[in-house]
Regions:
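Intracellular juxtamembrane helix-capping segments at the cytosolic ends
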Residues: 50, 128-141, 149, 349-362
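Conserved MFS/SLC helix-loop-helix module at the cytosolic interface between two early adjacent transmembrane helices
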Residues: 74-112, 303-309
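Helix-loop-helix hairpin linking two adjacent transmembrane segments in secondary transporters
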Residues: 156-203
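Interfacial helix-cap and linker-helix signal at transmembrane-aqueous boundaries
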Residues: 50-51, 82-83, 162, 166-174, ...
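Extracytoplasmic gate region of multi-pass secondary transporters
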Residues: 43-48, 231-299, 385
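Residue-level signature of mid-helix packing/kink "hotspots" within the transmembrane helices
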Residues: 41, 69-77, 161, 289-297, ...
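C-terminal transmembrane helical hairpin of 12-TM major facilitator-type secondary transporters
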Residues: 279-357
Length: 451
């Protein structure tokens, strides 16, 4: 469990020198997130080798992806509650063991059922790491919430960029089973080492010069003065709008994440060499992961300045345009690389904007648990993006209808953010802040201010 000089102790009773450096907390969370990225973002490289070895269909293989994402997301509310209760160090230590076992077990699986089980174990571990790292960033950085949550989420998006080439090479030389085992050991160890540096903020802790920062921050983000419990959050209409939006927006990126290899093969660009001896597929995955990482702090920073809902609207109009262009030009290797990258640049920000909006509207005390509930929407989306998209392709013999489903979801959610969520969130924040004032609760930031 978390053993620190400040665990459960009011901040006022702790000498400043004994409070952990919050930037070290951020770095440790980033490293842990990078170490779990391969479980999701390198998956597409394993699909065809697994098909060949286990003699199963693409739909059956992609059920593995759904199980991983479902367990990575649907257990996060409970895991987040444990992180809030026990602390991130102990919980991420448990997560590191599960992450390692997930890929090691997958490497030894000789049936599709055992692959489902072991990849699911990895999903549980990844969920602990993801929820714990994001929750810690929310708590340590109320003054830079969008940026620092974005940086943490970016690590999950960009982590595979540095490993995709060696993983692809190892797959060719040693096969997917050996690759799973070796990288499972590496990833588990890195998460374990990172977890040793993590700790919760002391009770009542605020960043340096917090009062001065509050006074200077312009009114750009809907921010509640009330820390809502998960049950209170579930009573808010805004939660259900956020959940539906998260589901629709997660769908598009998860389709490309899971199906990029089969898509490239369908359009005959998977083996075309485009750069330094690397195929269009490997280059695309590398570029995608880099942009998928960079987009998260970028749009987090943008949302700190123009508001979360405005950032969602702009980015997902861009996403819809990028998906449409990819549909038209996917058979050209260079455009395949460039436009799949643009899709990820417009998509990956949901993992910085939605945690930030959750913290803004429902407070930071239960931020890990509350965002964990919102994050389960990714698991719902995975059912449609993994086996669902593979089934639609098998039935139609084309990816066209899958692309159009992505475009429609992006456009609907973008307009929901601007026309529905934005005014509803503003009204809800005003009401909660008035309630807090009436109850004598100190309000650090009024409605439309940044927490």
């Amino acid at each position: 469990m978390e053993v620190t000089p400040m665990a459960g102790t009011p901040a006022a009773l702790i000498h400043p020198s004994r409070i952990p450096n919050r930037w070290l907390q951020l770095i440790a969370g980033i490293v842990a997130m990078m170490a779990i990225a391969n479980l999701q973002y390198a998956w597409t490289l394993f699909t065809k080798p697994i098909q060949a070895h286990l003699h199963v269909s693409l739909e059956a293989v992609q059920v593995t992806f759904f199980i991983f994402v479902a367990l990575e997301t649907w257990l996060v509310p409970f895991e987040g509650f444990l992180v809030d209760l026990i602390g991130p160090r102990f919980m991420l230590g448990i997560g590191s063991i599960l992450v390692g076992l997930g890929w090691i077990g997958s490497g030894r699986a000789e049936t599709i059922g055992s692959l489902y089980f072991w990849y699911g174990v990895g999903g549980v571990g990844a969920g602990i790491v993801y929820g714990g790292a994001i929750g810690n960033a929310l708590k340590w950085f109320p003054d830079y919430r969008g940026l620092c949550v974005g940086l943490t989420a970016a690590a999950f998006g960009i982590g595979t960029a540095t490993t995709i080439a060696p993983i692809a090479d190892m797959l060719k030389v040693s096969g997917y089973q050996h690759t799973f085992i070796v990288w499972g050991l590496i990833q588990g160890f890195v998460v374990l080492a990172s977890s040793l540096f993590l700790a919760r903020p002391p009770v009542g802790w605020t960043p340096p010069n917090w009062k001065e920062k509050e006074a200077k921050i312009k009114a750009k983000v809907n921010t509640s003065a009330v820390d809502m419990t998960p049950l209170q959050m579930l009573c808010q209409p805004s939660f259900y709008i956020i959940y539906v939006m998260m589901t629709m927006l997660a769908f598009g990126g998860l389709v490309v994440t899971a199906q990029l290899n089969p898509m490239a093969a369908s359009y005959h660009v998977d083996k075309v060499v485009v750069l330094w001896g690397m195929t269009a597929l490997v280059v695309a995955i590398t570029v995608d992961r880099i942009l998928n990482g960079l987009t998260r702090p970028f749009w987090g920073w943008v949302s700190d300045h123009i508001g979360r809902e405005n950032a969602i609207f702009i980015s997902f109009i861009l996403e819809a345009l990028a998906v449409y262009a990819l549909l038209q030009l996917i058979g050209h290797p260079v455009w395949f690389v460039a436009l799949s990258g643009l899709c990820f640049f417009a998509w990956g920000n949901i993992f910085s904007l939605f945690p930030s909006i959750t913290g803004d509207l429902y407070g930071k005390k239960w931020a890990t648990t509350n965002y964990g509930i919102v994050y389960t929407a990714k698991g719902v989306a995975a059912a449609f993006a993994g086996p669902g998209a593979a089934w639609l392709f098998a039935k139609t013999g084309s990816w066209t209808k899958v692309f159009w489903a992505m475009i429609v979801c992006d456009l609907i959610a973008a307009f929901m953010a601007l026309l529905w969520l934005k005014p509803l969130a503003a009204r809800a924040v005003r009401a909660s802040n008035q309630t807090a004032l009436g109850a004598g609760v100190p309000i650090s930031v009024k409605a439309r201010g940044v927490a």
